[in-house]
Structures are given as structure tokens and as C-alpha cells.
Curated annotation (Swiss-Prot):
Zn(2+) 3 binds at H180, D227, H229. It catalyses: Endonucleolytic cleavage to 5'-phosphooligonucleotide end-products. Its cofactor is Zn(2+). It comes from Nitratidesulfovibrio vulgaris (strain ATCC 29579 / DSM 644 / CCUG 34227 / NCIMB 8303 / VKM B-1760 / Hildenborough) (Desulfovibrio vulgaris). The keyword 4Fe-4S does not apply. It is an enzyme of class 3 (hydrolase). GO terms for biological process: base-excision repair. Keywords: DNA damage, DNA repair, Endonuclease, Hydrolase, Metal-binding, Nuclease, Zinc. CDD domains: AP2Ec. InterPro entries: AP_endonuc_2, AP_endonuc_F2_Zn_BS, Xyl_isomerase-like_sf, Xyl_isomerase-like_TIM-brl. The lineage of its organism: Bacteria, Pseudomonadati, Thermodesulfobacteriota, Desulfovibrionia, Desulfovibrionales. Zn(2+) 2 binds at E143, D177, H214, E259. This is Probable endonuclease 4.
Amino acid sequence: MPLFGAHMSAAGGVSNAIRDIVEIGGEVLQLFTANQRQWTPKAPSEADVEAFGRRRAAFGGPVFSHASYLINIANGDGAASAKAVEALVREFERCTALGVDAVVLHPGAHLGAGRGTGILRAARNIDEVFDRCGGQTPVLLLENTAGQGTCLGGDLNDLAEIIDASRHASQLGVCLDTAHAFGAGYALHTDEGYRRCMEDIEHGPGLAAVRLFHVNDSLVPCGSRKDRHTHIGEGQLGEAAFVRLLNDPVFAMHPMVLETPKEDGHAADRRNLATLRRLARS
């Protein structure tokens, strides 16, 4: 069975995210290591890093960070590109201090420059981040998108081409978001649509490149090019889509993280985790 968990808040200190994932019975954690709405957020204190390490050792599961949504790694503007690179370097530094396994990053938007140009810019900027960090760094996972606007990643080949264009391809992988794939036109709720998605992964970045799943149902229709998450089984993907994924032997031990609404605190996370585990036994 896959490892199930959720994105948890780090409010009050990053170690609180570990505390809360244990409380809800999660086996894998995703978090923001700092305020993702700020370009230069405050780094975790030394005491919080130590507390995170203690709780992480007791938790024992994989930990992922989601990079700030402010970062457009495909930006070609000099100042904006430098700002994106700097923000990702700082993210890597925080993750290295915390012992985070991998960083999830949206592949960015080309802003009208064209898909090919955006892909090359993303690869160049990613290479600069790895060059500046050197040594031991977390793995960087490029997340697929719903393909909204000029965003890269709606086509899974975008992720493959960024990886192929990077000098640090061995340190790159893929995070597959079910709601994003659905929004981009992959009908994961049908046998044919699921098969097409898996074939595009296999012929693009490769199945081995997929290190993490974001398991989210979708409020919007397939192919809408929109990104609206909802609870498992309550959206247009429906339970059938998740039965296919959760019981696919290729991903039998993969980490899978919820990014579903938290309007009632941790209760929704508990319900969604219970649903995933039930469907994984279907």
C-alpha cells in the first residue's frame, strides 16, 4: 500500500508540522519551510530546527517541502529570474538544515516567450540553484500543472524536457498532482484516460522519475485548465480514479500527500486519509 500523508501547516514553528502529521496518523509529510507568501521569509530558528530533527527521527516517514508559489523558475527577466533563483537557493538551504528529502516546485510560466524558451530558462535557472548550493542538496521534484495560462507542466513532456535540458538531471524528479492532471485533460476517472496519463509519463520523464503524488479530487471538469482541489471522492474525479492509482502495483510504495481543504481543521485530513486507505484495499 502507498504511504499516505498530508500537507501540514508549520505555523508556530516547522516542528509543529511533524507533531500534527503524527496526530492525524499520516505516514508522509509535506510542509512549507517558511512563509511562502514572502520573498525573504524568516528562516526557522536553531531551536526549531533541533525540535524538528527530534520529531522527525521519531516520525520516521519521508518529508517533502513545497517551494513558494512566488517562484517562477521559467522567468527570463534578469531581475525576476535572479529573485526566483535566490528564493529557491534559500529553500534548499532551509531543507538541508532540516533534513528534508525533496523540494516540490512548479515548473513556472513562460509569460509569452514560448514553451521551448520557457523550458530552457527553467533548466538554466535550476542549474544555477544546484551550482550555487553544491554538495548535498535535496532532490527537486517538478510538479505537473493544469496548464493554465502560459504555465509549463500541463503537458507532461514539459517536465521531461526540463529534466533533459538540465546538467543536474540525476537530482531531478517528478511530483504528479491528480487534480492538475485532470485539469490538463487527463481523464483519470476512466481506464483509457488513466492509461494515457501513465503512457505519457513512461514516454516522457519516465515512471521511475515519479517520486511523489499529490492526491486531490477536482472541483472543475477534465480539461478545464483550472486548478481547484476538493476532498477525495467529492469532486469530478470521484473515487474510481483513486482506486486505479492506489492499486497500481507500479506505485505500491509511493508517498502520496493530500492538499485538500482544511475548513474543519484536522478532521478533514483524517477523513481523507481514511478514504484513501479504504480505496487502496478495494
